[in-house]
């Protein structure tokens, strides 16, 4: 069964798209084949839109089953078809999807995220929020992928970071890559508790690691 795809002829799915348990958000112009695959594998409604006029929807938004956040300067009308609350995150760290790693119970955010932004994240997503890094990177949304079942992270994650991740998410954690060695696993993978789709350059070995981490094996 095919579980890899490109968006805009590019395998960095997490930059262009994002997903929750209920929806996947993709940029306008995404090929019908990709939309159909996401709908089938993730068992979600697929919504096509632009965030602040941009196609990098995955970098500019982050959501879960409780709500969605979009980057400063965007408009909540960009996600008017999402059936949960949507709010703008008024933070200088504008690539919301890059700096928030979240599921339905917890979130890890860039260490420079402001207290006021953390309050917004907690309220909109309905989760406990913690600051941290993965492999020394504040872009935790690209350095990891978390569902309600498991967590896959950058292979250079440190023991101290793993300990924090275990405390925050209380989930099993695996290390891996996507797209033929990309350590920024969040850039090459969309996943929820029902399924996953990876970038087209992802190898069979990498897909196996994804399935182990997120309990699809």
From Swiss-Prot:
- Give the SUPFAM superfamilies listed for this entry: Pentein (SSF55909)
Record-linked Pfam families: eIF-6 (PF01912)
Q: Does the keyword Protease apply?
A: no
**Keyword Protein biosynthesis on this protein?**
yes
Which keywords does UniProt give here? Answer: Initiation factor, Protein biosynthesis
Give the UniProt record's GO annotations in the biological process aspect: cytosolic ribosome assembly
Q: Name one GO molecular function term.
A: translation initiation factor activity
Query: What the protein does?
Result: Binds to the 50S ribosomal subunit and prevents its association with the 30S ribosomal subunit to form the 70S initiation complex.
Q: Please state which protein family the record places this protein in.
A: Belongs to the eIF-6 family.
| NCBIfam families on file | eIF-6, PRK04046.2-1
**What's the protein here called?**
Translation initiation factor 6
Q: To which species is this protein native?
A: Methanococcoides burtonii (strain DSM 6242 / NBRC 107633 / OCM 468 / ACE-M)
